[in-house]
Amino acid sequence: MSPGNTTVVTTTVRNATPSLALDAGTIERFLAHSHRRRYPTRTDVFRPGDPAGTLYYVISGSVSIIAEEDDDRELVLGYFGSGEFVGEMGLFIESDTREVILRTRTQCELAEISYERLQQLFQTSLSPDAPKILYAIGVQLSKRLLDTTRKASRLAFLDVTDRIVRTLHDLAKEPEAMSHPQGTQLRVSRQELARLVGCSREMAGRVLKKLQADGLLHARGKTVVLYGTR
């Protein structure tokens, strides 16, 4: 990602739903047929124009899905973590190339399997697991649709301060959030917060200062303690 890129309206990180109700045996059998790869932080796994033929499963770490405009602006469509599928639309809608960026947010281990190979396995060794895997993917797609609808409503009806407050409360429910004697401790930069709510970095900083003055949180550097959220 070039340093000059700017990021606009985004969805927030959602609660990861580990395995999406898939049992350990199903996951183990799925992973046995997949290729595991490790990626460093902030690595583009694929970009627009790359061949679209692979389903990804996040074993560990966190990734983002990003739409990129011609002027290098970026729209973060979502953050996804351990136990979630990425690139699942290709199982149902045929497309030759990718239209978005898959970028790691942390060090990640991903399981990768081609759509063609997975469809073959659904007819053979993964036949008993196929309904469970497809149902889990359907649940995931439904959650993402609901999340997108909720975020669109926030952008339409809430001001920046309200969006930041709600986003911080969303982040407080994430596995990365840490318990704190006064509430919940988050690690989020002003830039990342701006990307999550669709405002400038400067605006995000001003809102955090206001919320701190109002006694709702304490912010220092990338650390935010959100009071009363344990």
UniProtKB/Swiss-Prot annotation:
Start and end residues of each HTH crp-type domain: 158-230
SUPFAM superfamilies per UniProt: cAMP-binding domain-like, Winged helix' DNA-binding domain
SMART domains: cNMP, HTH_CRP
Keyword flag DNA-binding: yes
GO cellular component: cytosol
Keyword check for Transmembrane helix: no
Principal subcellular localization: cytoplasm
Regulation: Allosterically inhibited by cyclic di-GMP (c-di-GMP), which binds to Clp and abolishes its ability to bind its target gene promoter.
Disulfide bonds: none
Residue ranges flagged as DNA-binding region: 190-209
Binding site for a nucleoside 3',5'-cyclic phosphate: 18-139
Compartmental location: Cytoplasm
Gene Ontology MF terms in the entry: catalytic activity; cyclic-di-GMP binding; DNA binding; DNA-binding transcription factor activity; protein dimerization activity
PROSITE patterns given in the database record: CNMP_BINDING_3, HTH_CRP_1, HTH_CRP_2
Record keywords, A-Z: Activator, Allosteric enzyme, c-di-GMP, Cytoplasm, DNA-binding, Repressor, Transcription, Transcription regulation, Virulence
Top-rank taxon, per record: Bacteria
Protein's job: Global transcriptional regulator that regulates virulence factors production by activating or repressing the expression of a large set of genes in diffusible signal factor (DSF) pathway.
Annotated NCBIfam families: PRK11753.1 (NF008732)
Protein name from the UniProt record: CRP-like protein Clp
Natural source organism: Xanthomonas euvesicatoria pv. vesicatoria (strain 85-10)
Lineage: Bacteria, Pseudomonadati, Pseudomonadota, Gammaproteobacteria, Lysobacterales
Annotated gene: clp
